Every structure is written in C-alpha cells, then in structure tokens.
C-alpha cells in the first residue's frame, strides 16, 4: 500500500486508497449526483452478522442505501476494476440481502454496473433503468 488515502464522505474520514475503495467512492458520487440519493441516507462498510447460534459470521456490505424510516432499501457491492462481475459477485450481494432484505441490489467494478430489483414474486431481475432515490425507497413492487 502506498500510504495514499481518499476521503469517505459517509464515514467522514480518510481511508486507505485501494482499487476497491476508489470504486466505492466513485459510486457514492454517482448515487448522490445522478441517482439523487442524499448523503445522509447512505452508509459504507455496514457490518452485520449472518447465520444462527455459534456459526454466525461477520459480513460487511460496501454501501447500504436507507429509506426514510430508516430501513435498508438497497445494497451495493463494489469490486476492483479487474474483478469480473459474475454470478459469484451477485450471490455475495444476495447473501447479504438474506439479512438486510432490500428491494434493490447494485454490483459495480467501476467499469460495469448491474442493478437488479425484486419483483412482486420475490425474484430479483435485471432493472430496465438506473433507479433514482424515490424509486429505490418506493414500497411499490414491480414485476
């Protein structure tokens, strides 16, 4: 590590500048400027436990977007640009969703970004467009 840092506006501190962190900070900017997600409705590096009893494991979601309750509404999984966004990456986000129970998931490596939305039947499908914040927090489900 070179010792370089980047400002994380969500954690309000400098963090080590890694390739994944660069993608995370870029996507925070995209969500704020293009998707109109208020900064105070996002958190980065959100820790949670998954599993029952003594087999619980600690996990961290890269970014979680919250609705106005505040309850989780979207998970974002960020990868380095050289990581292919394959089924394993989406499976990781879906595992996180087993705990956080969101309607929207995004995965990005800074070069490609995929969004999926949960339909009325509970199945996640590719989103036909990038949702803005009001769509993300909407309680209405779509097929």
Regions found by a protein language model. Name each.
Residues 1-104, 111-143:
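A short, conserved, highly charged catalytic patch centered on acidic carboxylates
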